[in-house]
Regions:
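Donor-nucleotide binding loops and adjacent catalytic segments primarily
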Residues: 74-163, 195-199, 204, 211-220
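An aromatic- and histidine-rich active-site surface loop
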Residues: 1-15
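Conserved donor-binding/catalytic loop of nucleotide-activated donor transferases
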Residues: 15, 158-160, 174-185, 205
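C-terminal alpha-helical cap of glycosyltransferases
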Residues: 246-263
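Short alpha-helical segment that forms part of, or immediately flanks, the ligand-binding pocket
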Residues: 10, 154, 172-180, 200
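Short hydrophobic beta-strand element within catalytic cores of glycosyltransferases
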Residues: 165, 181-192
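A short, well-ordered alpha-helix in the C-terminal region of glycosyltransferases
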Residues: 81, 233-247
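Active-site-proximal region of nucleotide-activated glycan assembly enzymes
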Residues: 13-76, 85
Length: 263
């Protein structure tokens, strides 16, 4: 699905070749809405997708998640040692993706004194573009660990008590598997604001918190630090997001493809 594969799938449909699309988000894009009228299957990851597609074509598969996250084996102490953190203070993981998330980074930068005063540790993944500036800002705060990119996300997820992230479909699917309390700051720079809709779907199930991008610099860390003082609410969020995990999504999608090949 999506605009990149749209012409190929459209040509296949015109030629009578069976097609499948996977809609990863909670709000279907324009191309998938068009393609969805003639596909054999639509593999989805959110409830309510009959708003966009023929209900008979919809199969709830979830979104594939990389095996390293599905099968995390590292222990807590090993993860803490990797980042040079301790078990006595809570840990916030801030994830901006490989390119970084400007507003999220600005929110951390504006809150370093507040974070230090709260006695909280932070793993701050900035993206390459913001790394040097963030490293300079955090150099006076030894409990804030700055990385441009984290290859060992299994360690980061294991160490974290709360995770701050954008709300892309793949990221949300990973975080459902991880099952930690999450605060989402959806990117406003995406088609049809689909990240906000992704996050709202979790908020509606009490499975995450949502801070609009426009409010993040003022409120993100107030909300996050306040949440750290509410262990029962943290547990509720963790339990509810974990309940949304679909660890065998890739297998389900493959099964749908195989079934169509055999019909």
């Amino acid at each position: 699905g999506g605009y990149a594969s749209g012409p190929m799938l459209y040509a296949a449909q015109k030629s009578g070749i069976p097609t499948i699309i996977q809609e990863q988000n909670s709000y279907a894009g324009v191309t998938n809405k068009i393609l969805g009228k003639r596909v054999k299957r639509v593999c989805v990851a959110y409830d309510g997708m009959e708003r966009f597609f023929n209900p008979q074509a919809i199969v709830f598969t979830g979104n594939p998640v990389r095996p390293a996250i599905q099968n995390i084996t590292c222990g807590l102490q090993e993860s803490l040692d990797f980042f040079g953190l301790n078990a006595q203070s809570k840990i916030i993981l801030v994830v901006g993706g490989s390119l970084g998330a400007r507003t999220v980074n600005q929110s951390v930068a504006a809150s370093v004194e507040k974070i230090a005063k709260a006695g909280v540790q932070v793993i701050w993944q900035t993206g390459k573009q913001y790394y040097e500036e963030a490293k300079h800002i955090a150099q006076a705060y030894p409990t804030i660990k700055v990385y441009d990119f984290i290859r060992q996300m299994d360690y980061a997820y294991t160490a974290a008590d709360i995770i701050i992230s954008r709300a892309g479909a793949g990221t949300i699917s990973e975080l459902c598997i991880v099952g930690k309390p999450c605060v989402f700051v959806p990117s406003p720079n995406v088609t049809e604001d689909h990240q906000t809709k992704n996050a709202q779907a979790l908020v509606a199930k009490q499975a995450a918190l949502l801070i609009p991008d426009a409010d993040a610099k003022d409120t993100l860390f107030d909300v996050t630090l306040d949440l750290l003082q509410q262990p029962e609410r943290m547990q509720l969020l963790a339990t509810n997001i974990k309940a949304l995990a679909i660890p065998n999504a890739a297998e389900k999608i493959v099964n749908e493809i195989v079934n169509i090949l055999h019909t």
